[in-house]
């Protein structure tokens, strides 16, 4: 089964979404999105948090400045009890930039 909790939501980051966590079994959190930077040869970093705890980080080297880049899709495993949850996508450093031209999707696979 799968459940989309953020669907093609435009930036900027951070993006927060509250939802009911669907299972007490292990779940894979799949995250995709894009970002850009104002400086060439900079590491783009996207942090994925559940209940304000870092679940994982997605990184992509931006060779050119001012170009939106697709980030690699991140897959992160987590065990958690069924209850209300808050998922947050946030820039992982001060050189990662997002705006309304960047879109983010998060799906739970269980």
Segments (PLM) and residue ranges:
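Terminal beta-strand-rich extracellular "head" domains
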Residues: 7-9, 30-106
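Extracellular and analogous surface-interaction loops
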Residues: 16-26, 75-82, 109-110
């Amino acid at each position: 089964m799968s459940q989309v909790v953020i669907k093609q939501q435009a930036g900027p980051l951070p993006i927060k979404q509250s939802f009911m966590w669907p299972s007490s079994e292990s779940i894979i959190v799949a995250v995709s999105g894009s970002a850009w930077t104002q400086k060439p040869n900079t590491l783009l970093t996207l942090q994925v948090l559940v209940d304000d705890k870092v679940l994982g980080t997605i990184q992509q080297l931006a060779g050119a400045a001012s170009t939106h880049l697709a980030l690699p899709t991140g897959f992160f495993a987590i065990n958690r009890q069924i209850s209300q949850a808050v998922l947050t996508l946030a820039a992982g450093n001060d050189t990662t930039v997002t705006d309304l031209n960047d879109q983010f999707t998060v799906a739970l696979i269980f």
